[in-house]
């Protein structure tokens, strides 16, 4: 028998499993004060999940508010939607807008790698749909333990196949991403997914239930027991003891249903029969109903027993908490219901009226004619606790910073430099990712202009207009200094977009950290936010939204602080895009920017010095990044460049290797004056290499001078397969390529 509101009033002292559901004693007491009684089982289920770290951001909210202090303006105009909405929306002109967002699915992807990663893709796609947009592309950023670790061989293939199967079935190109390997991710991989969508301004949707008498329609997949965690405790121990006890499970995705749901939803938008829309993500119906109702101007009444079920034995608390995938909730006017149902039927998508908008200001949920939930929806969705967790600068960080990576020995002989280059390209950090990326369809839909292994992914929006995206993170640099590390991730993503020829306009993030109960972690988080806010303000790009994932740890060891930063760019003419591959024999190769001795957190430090981490990370130069971006965007418009590649992991050496291997051409260079290993392997930011034909050299050099970007002509593209560093060494490309391609297939047993 369901625990009703009437029963809760008459039995105030019933023992409830609030602690098992993750609530503190103070939080449980606050719920009782809000309600003026004990919560019912359904109410306790809703509050527990909506006040969880995952849904409420209770440990991070006070820091995240700083993003709201940034100007809500992009270089192209005001944001159309931002933090607090399902996804940020950016005006790109001509009545068009782009929405994009990144989210994490870390813990489910360790428990069940394939389904965990697949449903991570599905969830972020529905967030984009909920804004009224057609999803047009996805990206991912992954982090695993050591490549040769036994569990990596289990987790990595499952995660990659899950992403590939779901994204490919949806017909969405996977246009880019990143894969990291580091011991701290062993036992706690990171699976961060990004989706981008396109819409017209008039199609923008918000999750706001308004209009008394309007109907609440659930459409999509039936509801099952997958994804239930805390609610199973309520159902099996307290409220449905006779039912089957269900252990927490990872959600199960159905990409074919999601594809139907996408097309159905877009048809519903086009028909004008949707007043508001919300996807079913974490917390399922609990989240969708409370967020819709709290953002509206009235209340909502839901009849829970109308929800179509895959498992007829689910208790009401489980239905409220189920995270079954491929479900949406729409608010529909009664006179539009028939047309709404016709469109759903056309696509084979089940749709059921489960409630209506009311004028009560309350969220009422009934089960078989009895009230099991009676709450102010805002107290569930928005008024959760805001914690002030202790934060303290770690005692160990001074010692770490004093262990200067720049002081480590470096072999500057020709043989030593060649050996270092081969070691770096053959390392897990820099080796070929095609074993991963070849499983993704990068060109489905026919609008992909650039994709991996280019610096940014680029998609055509119309005949000429395009968007570019990049995702970047570096946990090693952020460990050394979280403020600077966050800015370095921002700068790299910003730079990757710019070197493709696009103007960077907006930012999303996915902040992956350890336990919020660890003061070291919260200090790292605080410093990260400060770094991102200051960096975004200086670069002139707003943070449109994102995600926080805490409790990423194995035993007592937290992962490295890993802020993933995604940058969106806009390019007026995709035909002027700049690829990263060398294209023409005889093209001049130029190094842009200033190179300093900066090895802290670098791949050279890690690989050559057996995992060493120490010193300070490279110093970001935000003004130099803006100047470099301005040069690259203008050079793209003028069609001056054959190729461009940013310098980051592995420095100049790795950029040369990648541009050669992608283009099937060699390069002959003479290093600028200075220590050869610094010139080749330092990771100073705000740098790029470009190639161009001779008749554009003077114009490009003048452009760089106009913006104050240092340039050095270091060599030329050659038509035979070698990388020649004059006076030091020469390596055949086929030898480099063998070292580069080998690590991941070998680790995967191929």
Swiss-Prot record:
NCBIfam families: FGAM_synth_II, PRK01213.1. Mg(2+) 2 binds at residues 127, 279. Mg(2+) 1 binds at residues 103, 547. It catalyses: N(2)-formyl-N(1)-(5-phospho-beta-D-ribosyl)glycinamide + L-glutamine + ATP + H2O = 2-formamido-N(1)-(5-O-phospho-beta-D-ribosyl)acetamidine + L-glutamate + ADP + phosphate + H(+). It holds the Pfam family AIRS_C. GO terms for molecular function: ATP binding; magnesium ion binding; phosphoribosylformylglycinamidine synthase activity. InterPro entries: PRibForGlyAmidine_synth_PurL, PurL_linker, PurM-like_C_dom, PurM-like_C_sf, PurM-like_N, PurM-like_N_sf. Pathway: Purine metabolism; IMP biosynthesis via de novo pathway; 5-amino-1-(5-phospho-D-ribosyl)imidazole from N(2)-formyl-N(1)-(5-phospho-D-ribosyl)glycinamide: step 1/2. GO terms for cellular component: cytoplasm. ATP binds at residues 57, 101, 509, 546. Substrate binds at residues 104-107, 126, 251, 323-325, 549. The active site is at residues 54, 105. Its EC number is 6.3.5.3. Part of the phosphoribosylformylglycinamidine synthase complex involved in the purines biosynthetic pathway. Catalyzes the ATP-dependent conversion of formylglycinamide ribonucleotide (FGAR) and glutamine to yield formylglycinamidine ribonucleotide (FGAM) and glutamate. The FGAM synthase complex is composed of three subunits. PurQ produces an ammonia molecule by converting glutamine to glutamate. PurL transfers the ammonia molecule to FGAR to form FGAM in an ATP-dependent manner. It is found in: Cytoplasm. This is Phosphoribosylformylglycinamidine synthase subunit PurL. GO terms for biological process: 'de novo' IMP biosynthetic process. Belongs to the FGAMS family. Keywords: ATP-binding, Cytoplasm, Ligase, Magnesium, Metal-binding, Nucleotide-binding, Purine biosynthesis. PANTHER family: PHOSPHORIBOSYLFORMYLGLYCINAMIDINE SYNTHASE SUBUNIT PURL. Monomer. Part of the FGAM synthase complex composed of 1 PurL, 1 PurQ and 2 PurS subunits.
């Amino acid at each position: 028998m369901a625990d009703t509101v009437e029963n809760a009033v008459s039995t105030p002292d019933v023992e409830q499993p609030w602690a098992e559901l993750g609530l503190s004693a103070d939080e449980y007491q606050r719920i009782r004060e809000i309600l003026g009684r004990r919560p019912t089982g359904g109410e306790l289920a809703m509050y527990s999940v909506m006040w969880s770290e995952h849904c409420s951001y209770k440990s991070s909210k006070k820091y995240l508010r700083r993003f709201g202090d940034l100007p809500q303006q992009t270089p192209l105009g005001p944001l159309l939607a931002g933090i607090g909405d399902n996804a940020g929306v950016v005006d790109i002109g001509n009545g068009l807008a782009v929405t994009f967002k990144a989210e994490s699915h870390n813990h489910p992807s360790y428990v069940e790698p394939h389904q965990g990663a697949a449903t991570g893709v599905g969830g972020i796609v529905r967030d984009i749909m909920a804004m009224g947009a057609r999803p047009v592309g996805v990206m991912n950023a992954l982090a695993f333990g050591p490549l040769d670790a036994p569990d990596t061989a289990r987790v990595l293939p499952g995660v990659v196949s899950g992403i590939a199967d779901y994204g490919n079935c949806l017909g969405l190109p996977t246009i880019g991403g990143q894969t990291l390997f580091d011991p701290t991710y062993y036992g706690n991989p990171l699976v961060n997914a990004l989706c981008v969508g396109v819409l017209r301004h008039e199609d923008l949707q918000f999750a706001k239930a308004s209009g008394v008498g309007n109907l609440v329609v659930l459409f999509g997949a039936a509801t099952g027991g997958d994804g239930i965690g805390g609610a199973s405790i309520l159902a099996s121990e307290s409220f449905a003891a006779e039912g089957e006890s269900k252990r927490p499970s990872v959600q199960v995705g159905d990409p074919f249903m999601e594809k139907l749901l996408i097309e159905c939803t877009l048809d519903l938008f086009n028909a004008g029969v949707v007043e508001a829309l919300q996807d079913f993500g974490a917390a399922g119906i609990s989240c969708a109903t409370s967020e819709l109702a709290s953002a509206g101007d009235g209340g909502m009444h839901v009849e829970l027993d109308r929800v179509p079920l895959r498992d007829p034995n689910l208790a009401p608390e489980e239905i409220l908490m189920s995270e079954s995938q491929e479900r949406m909730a729409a608010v529909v006017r009664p006179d539009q219901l028939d047309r709404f149902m016709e469109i759903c039927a056309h696509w084979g998508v089940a749709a059921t009226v489960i409630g209506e908008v009311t004028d009560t200001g309350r969220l009422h949920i009934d089960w078989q004619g009895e009230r099991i939930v009676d709450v102010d929806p805002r107290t569930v969705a928005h008024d959760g606790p805001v914690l002030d967790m202790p934060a303290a600068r770690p005692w160990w960080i001074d010692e770490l910073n004093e262990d200067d990576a720049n002081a480590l020995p470096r072999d500057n002989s020709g043989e030593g430099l060649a050996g270092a280059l081969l070691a770096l390209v053959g390392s897990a950090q820099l080796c070929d990712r095609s074993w991963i990326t070849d499983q993704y369809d990068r060109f489905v839909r026919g609008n992909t202009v650039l994709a991996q292994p280019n610096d940014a992914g680029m998609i055509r929006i119309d005949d000429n207009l395009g968007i570019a995206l990049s995702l970047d993170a570096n946990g090693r640099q952020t460990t050394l200094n979280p403020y600077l590390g966050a800015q370095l991730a921002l700068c790299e993503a910003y730079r990757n977009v710019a070197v493709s020829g696009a103007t960077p306009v907006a930012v999303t993030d996915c902040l992956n950290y350890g336990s919020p109960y660890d003061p070291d972690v919260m200090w790292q988080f605080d410093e990260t936010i400060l770094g991102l806010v200051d960096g975004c303000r200086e670069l002139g790009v707003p943070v449109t939204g994102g995600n926080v994932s805490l409790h990423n740890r194995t035993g007592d060891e937290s992962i490295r602080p890993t802020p993933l930063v995604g940058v969106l760019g806009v390019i007026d003419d995709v035909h002027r895009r700049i690829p990263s591959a060398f294209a023409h024999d005889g093209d001049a190769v130029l190094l842009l920017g200033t190179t300093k001795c900066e090895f802290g957190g670098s791949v050279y430090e890690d690989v050559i010095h057996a995992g060493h981490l120490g010193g300070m990370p490279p110093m970001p130069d935000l003004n130099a990044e803006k100047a470099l971006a301005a040069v690259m965007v203008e050079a793209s418009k003028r069609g001056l460049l054959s190729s461009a590649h940013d310098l980051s992991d592995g420095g100049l050496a790795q950029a040369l290797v990648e541009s050669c291997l992608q283009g099937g051409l060699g390069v002959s260079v003479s290093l600028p004056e200075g220590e050869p290993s610094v010139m080749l392997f330092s990771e100073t930011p705000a740098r790029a290499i470009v190639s161009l034909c001779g008749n554009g050299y003077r114009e490009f050099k003048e452009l760089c001078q106009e913006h104050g970007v240092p340039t050095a002509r270091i060599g030329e593209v050659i038509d035979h397969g070698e990388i020649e560093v004059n006076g030091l060494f020469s390596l055949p490309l086929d030898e480099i390529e063998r070292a580069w391609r080998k690590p991941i297939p070998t680790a995967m047993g191929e």
